[in-house]
């Protein structure tokens, strides 16, 4: 009898192994098919859809020749012709944690449903402490939503960031990288006010900090302690990036997260602590983004809008009292 049980168990394990191998081969085959199809379509050259000369009043190109997206510099229709044929899916992840307001989340998703990647497949990922206080969210066509409960506990603000990014790392590795071609991670206390389209897509996407864009690099609040992982010297640096929006391919977003987690671990070894935003700035100082979003994508409406900003794309939500 024992022999039969062991034989049956071995057979079941063999079947599971075969199914796993088949799934892996199918997944690899689908990825290769997409890569092959993508490679047969020539991606538009930068000069065919982006013209920095149309905005001489702003920094429209970085020192490493990445476009800084301002209203008037890009032609979305050229890129639409390319991405429509690829039938891409874009992910938008948001954390609903701590003292977040369900009304703020509802406003954010409602605005994203209206303006984020219109005409493309979009998956909204909500990572929450729990789902009991999440609002009802009605979505349009080509939009789906997934909710995940965050695992782990946090004690401080930075512990919360670390917990969030650990969860995001796991979800990218286990799910997201197989579901979307591009991924954005945003904070829920924003609202999208104008079209957030395919001009923002790229291998890695960084958001300029609206306040620090108008300051000199020496004034930027980089990590200045030499022993800290996020250290950037006073004579170095080009931009200061905001943590409210980050994007790219799932694997590039994963690389950023792993850089942050490693930096946190290294700092704790040296009894140091730094913010997620400073680690993010160190990452983009080392690995330059291929798309940079202007302050139009990160504006605080409490401040007077400067003439450089023609159309606010993303704004901070007013605090709900």
From Swiss-Prot:
Listed InterPro entries: Glyco_trans_6, Nucleotide-diphossugar_trans
Pathway where it operates: Protein modification; protein glycosylation
Cofactor note: Binds 1 Mn(2+) ion per subunit.
GO molecular function: glycosyltransferase activity; metal ion binding; N-acetyllactosaminide 3-alpha-galactosyltransferase activity
Keyword match Transferase: yes
Localisation: Golgi apparatus, Golgi stack membrane
Catalyzed chemical reaction(s): a beta-D-galactosyl-(1->4)-N-acetyl-beta-D-glucosaminyl derivative + UDP-alpha-D-galactose = an alpha-D-galactosyl-(1->3)-beta-D-galactosyl-(1->4)-N-acetyl-beta-D-glucosaminyl derivative + UDP + H(+)
Active-site residues (renumbered): 277 (nucleophile)
Disulfide bonds: none
Lumenal side: 25-321
A single cellular component GO annotation: vesicle
Glycan-carrying positions: 87, 99
Keywords annotated in UniProt: Glycoprotein, Glycosyltransferase, Golgi apparatus, Manganese, Membrane, Metal-binding, Signal-anchor, Transferase, Transmembrane, Transmembrane helix
Membrane-spanning residues: 7-24
Role noted for this protein: Synthesizes the galactose-alpha(1,3)-galactose group by catalyzing the transfer of a galactose residue, with an alpha-1,3 linkage, on terminal lactosaminide (Gal-beta-1,4-GlcNAc-R) disaccharide borne by a glycoprotein or a glycolipid.
More about this protein: This gene is not expressed in humans.
Family per record: Belongs to the glycosyltransferase 6 family.
Free-text note on domains in this protein's UniProt record: The conserved DXD motif is involved in cofactor binding. The manganese ion interacts with the beta-phosphate group of UDP and may also have a role in catalysis.
Stated name of the protein: N-acetyllactosaminide alpha-1,3-galactosyltransferase-like 1
Native species: Rattus norvegicus
């Amino acid at each position: 009898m024992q022999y039969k049980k062991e034989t049956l168990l071995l057979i079941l394990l063999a079947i599971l192994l075969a199914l796993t191998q088949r799934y892996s081969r199918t997944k690899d085959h689908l990825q290769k098919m997409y890569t092959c199809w993508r490679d047969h379509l020539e991606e538009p050259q930068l000069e065919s859809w982006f013209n920095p000369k149309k905005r001489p009043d702003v920094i429209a190109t970085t020192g490493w020749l990445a476009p800084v997206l301002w209203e008037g510099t890009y032609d979305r229709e050229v890129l639409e012709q390319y991405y429509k044929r690829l039938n891409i899916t874009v992910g938008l992840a948001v954390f609903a944690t701590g003292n977040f307001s369900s009304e703020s989340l509802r406003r954010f998703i409602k605005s994203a449903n209206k303006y984020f990647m219109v005409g493309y497949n979009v998956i909204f990922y909500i990572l929450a402490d729990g789902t009991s206080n999440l609002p009802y969210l009605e979505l349009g066509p080509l939009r789906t939503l997934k909710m995940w409960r965050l695992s782990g506990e946090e004690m401080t603000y930075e512990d919360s960031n670390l917990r969030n990014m650990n969860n995001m790392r796991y979800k990218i590795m286990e799910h997201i990288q197989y579901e979307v071609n591009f991924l954005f991670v945003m904070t829920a206390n924003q609202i999208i006010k104008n079209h957030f389209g395919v001009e923002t897509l790229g291998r890695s996407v960084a958001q300029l900090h609206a306040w620090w864009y108008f300051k000199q690099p020496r004034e930027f609040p980089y990590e200045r302690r030499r022993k800290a992982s996020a250290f950037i010297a006073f004579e170095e640096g080009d931009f200061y990036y905001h943590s409210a929006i980050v994007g790219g391919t799932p694997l590039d977003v994963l690389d950023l997260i792993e850089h942050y987690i490693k930096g946190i671990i290294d700092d704790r070894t040296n009894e140091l602590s730094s913010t997620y935003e400073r680690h993010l700035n160190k990452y983009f100082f080392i690995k330059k983004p291929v798309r940079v979003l202007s302050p139009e994508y990160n504006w605080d409406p409490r401040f007077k809008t400067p003439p450089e900003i023609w159309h606010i794309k993303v704004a901070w939500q007013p605090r709900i009292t």
